[in-house]
Amino acid sequence: MDEDTRAEYESTSQQLRIDLKTWETDWAKSHEGKKPGRGDIKANEDIAAKYKQYNKVRDILSGKISPPSKHAPKSTKRKSDGLSAQTPIKQNKHIETPAKNRTQNHDEDLMNTPAISRKLFSPTSVTSVGPTPQRDGQVLGLFDLLVEKELGTPSKKDSATKTGSARKVDATPSKRSAATDDDEDERLGRTPMSSSKRQRLDHFLTPLKNKDGNKDAATPSSVSKLQFDTPAFLKRNTLPVLEENGDFDAPAPLRLPRKPFARGLSEIVASLRKVEEESLDDDLDALRDIEDGGMGEPKPKTLFPSKPKDDILVDDNEARQLPLGGFDDEGVYDSPVEGDNPTRVYKKKGQKRTTRMAKMRPVRVNRPENMAANPQSDVENDEIQAGGEDAGSDFDDIVEKKPAQKKEGTVKKAARKVNELAHANFQRLKLRNHGAKGGPGINSRFRRRK
């Protein structure tokens, strides 16, 4: 918006604002100092129009609405014609059957540009898939359709084409020649044969001599005219003509992708590390000079420095702290296994053990001295003691003590005998999750077969 237009809109807005303020002041005086509401503004059509115009001008100045053009475009809406006074005349439709054009000149089709080839080979977008073209139950290919439709299929023999004159329906019938009558009578006088019989008999017949061989003689057309070659837009690239007698050229060198000129991050880190190591080596050399000579003359540098002595017998287990972090040199750890730096192979963890492990170890238990009382065992022990190793010796003089007789009393129920040699491995465990996987018949070799 130029300055003149803006100044014009600003003056219009100022004038409208003065008019509206004057009306509001008069309204307030006549209505005890109250401001007019929406209903009061709408009741006065002149003031309502000024309010709308004022808001529109302010929106144009603020840029919310583009200013209207001075030359308003004329509406191109079509105006409806007035109603006609009289009834329109009904249009007569043609009831007669349209005549069929029976004359077909195939020579003109061959001379014109082949439209079928253009349709077949042009890259048009497929809108719908049609039925597969067939003939006598056999699927026709792309080039079969091309040849048939362009050159014409000799399936239907037209008598008008044979004689070379087009039939005229409306013309007066002319008298046929005698030769034509003879051919017609000969054709009608023969007994018709089936196509299979005629085809079988043709193998044994001598072919008739072509009396007029140059009647339909013509220069054979080239393959390019039949549109059998690949169209130009479908050819990928044209190959040069090969010389059969010439020597084979050496194969072109393989172009490998070049490395980028920009330095990689690992290369930058390695170069910075080298710079830091050189500065640290200089500091160490200065410290050694101070320790050795007490700030004396520096030692002359030799052309071939001697190798440091191998005083380190065992490497330090702690990893060396790198100042910048990352790799020591370029190309380290670029591949999974390189040199003496094999990567750690992680083993996939499987399912943990679900049964309780019990290691079977021999348990040494001393037999208790007081075993369960058995009368037979006591008698046997007494007999063994009576006739033992010391029988018949000096100990025979010792008076043998008679065993004390036990008093007969009430028989007590014997407690349940527990063998002390029973091992904990043969105890039944009370597992809380027993049967959680479906009971004893699940995943068992001894379950009942279905």
Swiss-Prot record:
GO terms, biological process: DNA replication initiation; double-strand break repair via break-induced replication; mitotic DNA replication preinitiation complex assembly
A GO molecular-function descriptor: single-stranded DNA binding
Region described as Disordered: spans on this chain: 59-137, 150-223, 288-413, 428-450
Predominant subcellular localization, coarse grouping: cytoplasm
Biased composition (Basic and acidic residues): 93-109, 150-160, 199-215, 398-411
A Pfam entry, by short name: Drc1-Sld2
GO cellular component, one term: DNA replication preinitiation complex
Compartment(s): Cytoplasm; Nucleus
Keyword terms of this UniProt record: Cell cycle, Cytoplasm, DNA replication, Nucleus
Biased composition (Basic residues): 345-364
Function as written in the Swiss-Prot or TrEMBL entry: Has a role in the initiation of DNA replication. Required at S-phase checkpoint.
Protein name: DNA replication regulator SLD2
Source species: Gibberella zeae (strain ATCC MYA-4620 / CBS 123657 / FGSC 9075 / NRRL 31084 / PH-1)
Taxonomic placement: Eukaryota, Fungi, Dikarya, Ascomycota, Pezizomycotina
